[in-house]
Curated annotation (Swiss-Prot):
GO terms for cellular component: acrosomal vesicle; sperm flagellum. Residues 25-293 form the Protein kinase domain. The keyword Cell membrane does not apply. ATP binds at I31, G32, H33, G34, S35, Y36, G37, S38, V39, K54. It comes from Homo sapiens. Serine/threonine kinase which is involved in male germ cell development and in mature sperm function. May be involved in the Cre/Creb signaling pathway. Phosphorylates CREB1 on 'Ser-133' in vitro and can stimulate Cre/Creb pathway in cells. Phosphorylates CREM on 'Ser-116' in vitro. Phosphorylates ODF2 on 'Ser-95'. The gene is TSSK4. This is Testis-specific serine/threonine-protein kinase 4. It is found in: Cytoplasmic vesicle, Secretory vesicle, Acrosome; Cell projection, Cilium, Flagellum. InterPro entries: Kinase-like_dom_sf (IPR011009), Prot_kinase_dom (IPR000719), Protein_kinase_ATP_BS (IPR017441), Ser/Thr_kinase_AS (IPR008271), TSSK4_cat (IPR047908). SUPFAM superfamilies: Protein kinase-like (PK-like). Its EC number is 2.7.11.1.
Length: 328
């Protein structure tokens, strides 16, 4: 695996439970499974706390994942500290596996909640969505995009607060400005950045991704947030993702709401602002200032708002003189 400074080297062993024991982690039951490995509960004996251990098999994982996406995921998570993001503690590498030690969210995920209980009340949807908004505002203010927002990546702690997880497609958006520029001036260039790595699930993907076009990753995040909010209050996805051509057609139209759900007009308006074409789509700054979100917001993220406002102001001033950057 590349970027060796990201990981701690671990002794070679065939049994990952034995290796985890050496580091003080007593591995328990599996709580999640993915393409390249599984997530387990574990007890960290040195601090007497429960954690989550994501164990990735190098044999199952692709070279692209091991050499590009996994190091990027760890690098991103190492710089993040926010109450609505899953905390990263450490990463350990052996000859056959990579172990990522994370904060444990003991309440399952929001998708499981919806499948069990159905649509959220609007106050509960407002609570969870405003927490999601605060977490994404924090990311975007640091020029970081998630690119895989979906209900199953919104975990719940024991108090049923949202914890955004799975940063496998997250990235720090590059800037073409010299290091000597002010941080805010360098950051603003992210708004002129387009991605061409087509990440995430079709059901949550913006129309630009579905059409295979370079896309603004900040606006792809806010589209996914629109899908999430719709599903919270309706209990099903806004678009049929079983057929790609049908999905693409549906995402070009204004989303409709079922008559048998009581949803406030404020909530509907916000969803419509997020589920629209990129040139008119709400940014995270628009969302965080929205009247419906403000009713449920536990606190005003004044630092993030100031950063985002400065970035938007600079972007609007300089965008005519900037060329688009396209990366993966």
């Amino acid at each position: 695996m590349g970027k060796g400074d990201v990981l701690e080297a671990a002794p070679t062993t065939t049994a990952y439970h034995s290796l985890m024991d050496e580091y003080g982690y007593e591995v328990g039951k599996a709580i999640g499974h993915g393409s390249y490995g599984s997530v387990y509960e574990a007890f960290y004996t040195k601090q007497k706390v429960m954690v989550a251990v994501k164990i990735i098999s190098k044999k199952k994982a692709s070279d692209d994942y091991l050499n590009k996406f996994l190091p990027r995921e760890i690098q991103v998570m190492k710089v993040l500290r926010h109450k609505y993001l899953i905390n990263f503690y450490r990463a350990i590498e052996s000859t056959s596996r990579v172990y990522i030690i994370l904060e444990l969210a003991q309440g399952g995920d929001v998708l499981e909640w919806i499948q069990r209980y159905g649509a959220c009340s609007e106050p509960l949807a407002g609570k969870w969505f405003s927490q999601l908004t605060l977490g994404i505002a924090y990311l975007h203010s640091k020029s970081i995009v998630h690119r895989d927002l979906k209900l199953e990546n919104l975990l719940l702690d024991k108090w049923e607060n949202v914890k955004i997880s799975d940063f496998g497609f997250a990235k720090m958006v590059p800037s073409n400005q010299p290091v000597g520029c002010s941080p805010s001036y360098r950051q603003v260039n992210c708004f002129s950045h387009l991605s061409q790595t087509y990440c995430g699930s079709f059901a949550y993907a913006c129309p630009e991704i579905l059409r295979g076009l370079p896309y603004n990753p900040f606006l792809s995040d806010t589209w996914s947030m629109g899908v999430i909010l719709y599903t919270l209050v309706v209990a099903h996805l806004p678009f049929d993702d079983t057929n790609l051509k049908k999905l693409l057609r549906e995402t070009q139209k204004e989303v409709t709401f079922p008559a048998n759900h009581t949803i406030s007009q404020e909530c509907k308006n916000l969803i419509l602002q997020m589920l629209r074409q990129a040139t008119k789509r709400a940014t995270i700054l628009d969302i965080i200032k929205d009247s419906w979100v403000l009713k449920f917001q536990p606190e005003q993220p004044t630092h993030e708002i100031r950063l985002l406002e400065a970035m938007c102001q600079l972007h609007n001033t300089t965008k005519q003189h900037q060329s688009l950057q396209i990366t993966t």
